[in-house]
Amino acid sequence: MQYKDSARLDSSQVTSSSGGGGAGGKMAVGGIGGIIIVLLAMFLGFDPGALVGGTAAGPQQSTDDYAQCKTGADIDTNRDCRFVAYTNSIQSYWSQALSGYQPTTTHIFTGQVSTACGTATSAVGPFYCPSDRIVYLDTGFFDQLTSQLGAQGGDAAEAYVIAHEYGHHISNLTGV
């Protein structure tokens, strides 16, 4: 994928955290079990954190790892800046295409993360939590996609996955 070197990036739309599991007593939920719990929470209106022993919490150990991502040229020296570019592009599109669009953030994590939907591990893959309206992404997912599943497409595939998660945000905002 080609990036315009002069493109300005807004790193405030991307946050990150690493490790940790949030409040004590929580159990990490991943894979199909995690998806089922989140779906049940969405349809039945309950806190999935109650099922795994604890109350829901927001992202822990938040850092500003993306502050150095200022322009498209920064992607050449720091590949992680591409997540800022994807997020900025997706938010720009929806801000123009959907009247009343409410921006959200992409939260990059490693290992596991506590969300308003409960604690999730990298086994869950990228997901959107409607309770806190945040897109969550463990970048190791893309490595796994390539190494274990043979996926190809590079940056375009990554952007597609993130855009898909933002689609859940749009559904949440519009009630569809």
Label each region the model flagged.
Residues 54, 112-138:
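Catalytic zinc-binding patch centered on the HExxH motif and its immediate surroundings
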Residues 141-160:
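Short pre-active-site segment immediately N-terminal to the catalytic Zn-binding motif
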